[in-house]
Amino acid sequence: HRLGIKPHFQLIFDDPVSTEEDKRKLFEMIATFPHPYDLYLFSMTVFPGSELNKKLIENGLIGKYDVDGIDNTRVFYQHRVNLSYPRPVEDTFWIALTQMLSKPFVPRSLLKGMSKSAFLRQHPWPVIQMANAANFVKMGQLAGGMAMRGEMTRTLVRRWMSMDRIITT
């Protein structure tokens, strides 16, 4: 921040090795980062024939249908993490909370309080809706700034009109 550089962090979710504790600790660590920063959340991709593929299958952490390719086309829809993708509710909970950490207008104290709720971990719908709303606000701020600078194009407007492409950083 002292040098005027905005940090960008890339995180990988949908990792079969990460535990609930790992996800909680990641959330808590990122919650200590000073604003401004952007988070880019990606879904782990296991490619057929890769070393990762072999090790995860050998250790029983994934099955052949978890490998991206012919039987699994998740990578087409889930390269960047999307809250509507079907995954375990606890994972969606942590992803939604983590997405909101990069939004300085969302109080961290609220997010930290929500992170401790066993009810919300099992029923993350309110957290997902809050994350979606925060993403819309950030997208509006970004689009407004681009429009003011004359950078907004019809192509960008069309691209952003899809819920699948909402800005989640």
What feature does the model see in each segment?
Residues 25-26, 54-60:
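Short secondary-structure boundary/capping segments
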Residues 1-51, 97-116:
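Conserved C-terminal portion of the radical SAM core fold
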Residues 51-56, 67-169:
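Radical SAM enzyme core and accessory elements
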